[in-house]
Amino acid sequence: MRQTFFLPSHVEGCCAALRRAGYAAYPVGGGVRDLLLGRAPQDWDVTTSARPEEILALFPGSVLTGGVHGTVTVPTPGGPVEVTPFRAEGGYSDGRHPDAVSFGVSLEEDLARRDFTVNALALAPNGTVIDPFGGLADLDAGVLRCVGNPARRFGEDRLRMFRALRLAAQLGFALYPTVEAALADAPSPANLAVERVGAEVDKALLSPRPGWVGEMLRYRLLVPWLGSTQADTTPLAALPARPLERWAGLAGLLDDGELPEKLR
């Protein structure tokens, strides 16, 4: 794991502007995780003590894109940065979205609502990694572990079950035993939008380990759309990592020519 961290200038600039205005600001989430793994982050998120209206006032041209979550997309020369206030969430009656969101909480409270320990990491201004839930050790061990109780986390947002398997495919990580147990007793994901499910399947299919899509079948996560189909998906790794080939390969293994349409 890398020990020296160089933030892209547009991310550092976004954080610096928030700090000059008197707010705390930390790069957080998947961008930090990928930076620590030596991977090129695809997206950057910043969490801050500023509220949505304060973020919008500070960055001309920024747009509120996260609705009740308060996420503001800040355009920069290096690409957009998603800036979100520290927040806590409560109640998930639909198994996907929080019933209530509150701002003005601490950084640790914000990190505590996140899905996996490796995504609950933040970078302090001096480059120190803020890691209240053991995410660094899990990165070193190559395991995906939930923040808190995995059954509760999956019950809050059932798309997290798909994210667990997709991240395992992308990162080459193993699932922590408690995560495996929660998946084996998972709630039905039938309430999820098929487009969101299909996007997670697509990312797993195009990863270096597309056979993990078979785990989605084994854990019966795709039953609402595909029924109880099972298949050995290891041959997918031999196909070029292009959407047409991988989707066609999966459709062939499942003997379902309509598969792509069912998950889009």
Regions found by a protein language model. Name each.
Residues 1-264:
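Catalytic cores of the polymerase beta-like nucleotidyltransferase superfamily
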